[in-house]
Amino acid sequence: MTGVRGNSVRLGDIVQIQKGKQINSEILSSAGPYYVMNGGITPSGYYSQFNTEGNTISISEGGNSCGYVQFNEKPYWSGGHCYSLLNARPIVDYRFLFHTLKYHQDDIMALRIGSGLPNIQKKDIVSFPIMLPSLDEQRRFASVFDTLSFRLNIAEQVRVNYEKQKKYLMRCMFI
């Protein structure tokens, strides 16, 4: 997102950054109403309660994928290795913020410290710089990026289906 003009702000100045609450992995299930996000890219399991509303950005705090940026459409349990970005100020289009953070995901991942169980400290996430254009521009960018993401997801689904069809036809051909 080079070339975006606006004000440089710290992430912690435009959203509340809240670390999740750890729950014992022994009480997680393989299915349930709410997924549990911890330090990974995929859910750690499922739980009967949620502690974070849907339509929330999360950033993985610990583990090999710390710094991974995700948009959670549904309510979820934010675990002890997960930062949730809440209560965005009125000057922020939340979808624009998500796309901006996703674009800078490698930079966020570079904030990790430690080698055994790497993590990203809250102070580093709080001070992460964001270029914030006017709210109207944010909304325009977000609309374009949402449309592109939607189309990319469809294209990926089509590619996966073509791959399945190809494998099926290859099996039929060589039976």
Predicted regions and their residues:
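Non-catalytic DNA-recognition/assembly elements of restriction-modification systems
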Residues: 1-22, 26-38, 127, 132-135, ...
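Amphipathic alpha-helical coiled-coil/heptad-repeat segments
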Residues: 1-9, 131-175
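Generic alpha-helical structural context detector
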Residues: 12-16, 98-102, 171
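Residues within well-ordered alpha-helical secondary structure of globular protein domains
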Residues: 17, 103, 144-147
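A short beta-sheet element
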Residues: 38-104, 113-114, 121-125
